């Protein structure tokens, strides 16, 4: 891994760092011998030389640091806790904090800071690691070239992990200059001491190999940076360089597959993944990367993009199985429960991708229409990624879908054709028709337990949506960036160490361009606006389901006030506001919202600019990958949406006893759609109007045929006098089903 090798380089450099003008010849000789033994892998001899140095100079903390590093490598890098403890003690001993680094005098402590940054990197504390790395970069001039490169590579890796691709590419340009200048460009006084101990075997060939390896690594980082920026033209150029320098290795093929995925060449992306030779990979114990896990995960992402959701779930489950197998092997090595980071190589601290995979699997299950299974996956993922507002919205959508009882037709974006007759009871004169309830009023879900308990209920959906709103920045015109977001093990960070995930508690770092939403890609300004609109729409729906009409009206009004509102959500906003107003007995205001002219567009409203920039196309969030492929729910056209408005408007007129206006709305809506598309609620509305008009036989015919009858048009003129007047006026049938249409 990128930071694993720098750790080795850092230890090697510090062995020679003790050679200064104030030391004796004996100390120089012991230091050189210790460095040579460390470089050759003879850690026992190295520790013996360091022990002799410690006897001579007991006050030099660098010897203690080198001893800790040598012990760490002697134990195959499995004693991370001990090394971390030693570094913290040394930091307190020199009374130096990163924030206090303000001059070249602190260069002497550079190796201590660097090793701390490497450990923070492996502990997934990326924000803190960047803080240390950037301080080191400020004093990079006096560093010798190899150490300077190690610092730069570590920072590049961290910038890629935290979605700061621009910074990473700038630093890569600096690295290219550094390498092109050769070994004489950055050398300080420390380098001469180190070079004297390396004159063993063919330094020119070794140097050339290191330069080629560094160039290959730079090309791979550039590809990853351009992929994050969705700069496909620049990425295409760098892909050629990667294939020339790295050949058909697994990292290069995974990167090229990611590139083809972003271009929409899904079959080619699958072909490239299948052509990678996973067996040649060194294995997760050496690199910290489970290539098989990444392979299945990437296949799941690609098949989602191809709308093959069940195959995508299959591949994500395979990835989860591989990840669980790897974690089981790693946990078997740990013996001391008090040292949770020890007992396995430090690089394997980044291996576990369970929560990223659960996130992907949950989103995939939600799209395929299995909300309860999706909820189980996402509720586990949210324990780690609790600062992701988009994840809280997805959890709320799981709760809504689970309690809505969405049919297969609704899942496919079609109106349902439910029968209006539930059963027939009695015989002869006592024969009665029992009408099916078309109302989807939510029952009481809280059966004595707290609504905060994570179950797929509407009450818990309300909590999830409140969390999502609170996590959004107050001023979306200038959203605060909290760098530290991390991609999941997806196509974006294929075989590099960017497969690890950032913890959710990250602080504002630099540039107010986005806020993190790990494990998916960060939320930029336009995406934040779209996300807020979706959260408000769901909040209004949930408030209606819970009977909180004032809150529903508040959310609907906020939704309609959003400056960039898609046509589909504007349609829902008017419907939800109207339903809340009707429940509050403000029918006149509701009729204003139900004006069919309010509906001019029902698109999802993702602009072409946004798609080009990829702001809603996280390379690491499979299910969010492309808004234009999102399933369109009913109504799918302006005409269908206006019929829904007219049906609901007719119901509102019925509540004011304006039956002629209601009948007119009903007829107008029925003329705009196919007779088979008329919803059962509209048939019940027509039945109610005929009963109110005294035409019982026609009402029975409608119920029997389950459709509107053309003859209904003439009855407003034929029946002028009331033959049958009920003692109690018939109440209009409520139709909340019209306003429960949801858009993912």
Swiss-Prot record:
Swiss-Prot/TrEMBL keywords: Acetylation, Coiled coil, Cytoplasm, Nucleus, RNA-mediated gene silencing, Transcription, Transcription regulation, Translation regulation
Biased composition (Polar residues): 484-495, 602-612
Modified residues (N-acetylalanine): 2
Record bears the keyword Zinc-finger: no
GO BP field: regulation of translation; regulatory ncRNA-mediated gene silencing
Keyword Transcription on entry: yes
Region Disordered: start-end pairs: 1-26, 182-203, 475-521, 602-634
Lineage top rank: taxon: Eukaryota
Cellular location(s): Cytoplasm; Nucleus
Coiled coil: 73-107
Basic and acidic residues bias spans: 1-16
Family: Belongs to the CNOT10 family.
Physiological role: Component of the CCR4-NOT complex which is one of the major cellular mRNA deadenylases and is linked to various cellular processes including bulk mRNA degradation, miRNA-mediated repression, translational repression during translational initiation and general transcription regulation. Additional complex functions may be a consequence of its influence on mRNA expression. Is not required for association of CNOT7 to the CCR4-NOT complex.
Name listed for the protein in its UniProt record: CCR4-NOT transcription complex subunit 10
Organism: Mus musculus
């Amino acid at each position: 891994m990128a930071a694993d090798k720098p750790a080795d380089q850092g230890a090697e450099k510090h062995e020679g760092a003790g050679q200064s003008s104030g030391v004796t010849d004996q100390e120089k000789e012991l230091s050189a011998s210790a460095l040579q033994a460390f470089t050759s892998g003879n850690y026992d001899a190295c520790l013996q030389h360091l022990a002799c140095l410690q006897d001579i100079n007991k006050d030099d903390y660098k010897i203690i640091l080198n001893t800790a590093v040598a012990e760490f490598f002697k134990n195959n890098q499995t004693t991370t806790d001990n090394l971390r403890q030693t570094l913290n003690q040394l930091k307190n001993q020199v009374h130096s904090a990163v924030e206090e680094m303000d001059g070249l005098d602190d260069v002497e402590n550079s190796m201590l800071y660097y090793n701390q940054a490497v450990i923070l990197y492996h502990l997934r504390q990326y924000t803190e690691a960047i803080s240390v790395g950037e301080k080191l970069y400020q004093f990079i001039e006096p560093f010798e070239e190899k150490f300077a490169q190690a610092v730069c590579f570590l920072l590049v890796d961290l910038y890629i992990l935290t979605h700061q691709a621009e910074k990473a590419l700038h630093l890569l340009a600096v690295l290219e200059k550094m390498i092109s200048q050769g070994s004489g460009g950055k050398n300080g006084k420390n380098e001469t001491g180190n070079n004297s101990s390396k004159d063993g075997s063919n330094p020119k060939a070794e140097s050339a190999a290191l330069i080629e390896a560094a160039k290959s690594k730079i090309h791979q980082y550039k590809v990853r940076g351009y992929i994050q920026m969705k700069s496909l033209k620049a990425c295409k150029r760098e892909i050629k360089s990667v294939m020339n320098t790295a050949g058909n290795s697994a990292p290069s093929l995974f990167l090229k597959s990611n590139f083809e995925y972003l271009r929409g060449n899904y079959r080619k992306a699958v072909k490239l993944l299948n052509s990678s030779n996973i067996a040649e990979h060194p294995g997760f114990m050496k690199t910290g990367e489970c290539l098989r896990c990444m392979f299945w995960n990437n296949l799941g992402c690609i098949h989602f993009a191809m709308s093959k959701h069940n195959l995508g779930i299959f591949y994500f489950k395979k990835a989860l199985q591989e990840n669980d197998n790897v974690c089981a092997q790693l946990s078997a090595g740990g013996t001391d429960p008090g040292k949770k980071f020890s007992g396995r190589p430090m690089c394997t601290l980044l291996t576990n991708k369970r929560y990223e995979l659960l996130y992907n699997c949950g989103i995939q299950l939600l799209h395929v229409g299995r909300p309860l299974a999706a909820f189980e996956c996402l509720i586990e993922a949210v324990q780690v990624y609790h600062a992701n507002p988009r994840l809280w919205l997805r959890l709320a959508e799981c709760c809504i879908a689970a309690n809505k009882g969405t049919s297969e037709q609704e899942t496919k974006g079609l109106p349902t054709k439910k029968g209006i007759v539930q059963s027939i009871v009695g015989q002869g004169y006592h024969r009665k028709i029992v009408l099916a309830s078309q109302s989807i009023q939510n029952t009481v879900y809280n059966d004595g337990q707290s609504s905060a308990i994570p179950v797929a209920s509407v009450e818990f959906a309300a909590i999830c949506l409140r969390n999502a709103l609170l996590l959004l920045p107050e001023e979306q015109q200038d959203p605060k960036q909290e760098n530290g977001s991390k991609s999941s093990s997806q196509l974006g960070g294929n075989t590099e160490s960017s497969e690890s995930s950032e913890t959710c508690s990250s602080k504002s770092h630099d540039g107010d361009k986005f806020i993190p939403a790990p494990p998916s890609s960060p939320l930029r300004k336009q995406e934040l606006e779209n996300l807020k609109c979706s959260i408000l729409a769901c909040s209004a729906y949930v408030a209606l389901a819970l009977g909180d009409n004032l809150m529903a009206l508040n959310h609907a009004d906020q939704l309609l006030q959003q400056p960039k509102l898609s046509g589909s959500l504007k349609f829902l906003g008017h419907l939800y506001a109207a339903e809340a107003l009707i429940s509050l007995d403000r029918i006149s205001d509701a009729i204003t919202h139900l004006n069919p002219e309010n509906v001019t567009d029902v698109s999802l409203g993702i602009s072409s600019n946004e798609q080009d920039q990829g702001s809603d196309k996280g390379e690491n969030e499979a299910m969010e990958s492309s808004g234009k492929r999102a399933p369109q729910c009913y109504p799918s056209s302006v005409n269908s949406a206006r019929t829904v408005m007219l049906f609901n408007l007719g119901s509102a007129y019925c509540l004011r006893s304006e039956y002629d206006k209601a009948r007119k709305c009903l007829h107008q809506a029925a003329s705009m759609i196919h007779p088979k598309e008329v919803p059962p609620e509209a048939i019940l509305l027509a039945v109610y109007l005929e009963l109110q008009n005294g035409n019982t036989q026609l009402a029975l015919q409608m119920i029997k045929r389950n459709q509107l009858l053309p003859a209904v048009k003439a009855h407003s003129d034929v029946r002028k006098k009331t033959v049958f007047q009920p003692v109690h006026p018939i109440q209009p049938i409520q139709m909340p089903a019209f306003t429960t249409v949801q858009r993912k």
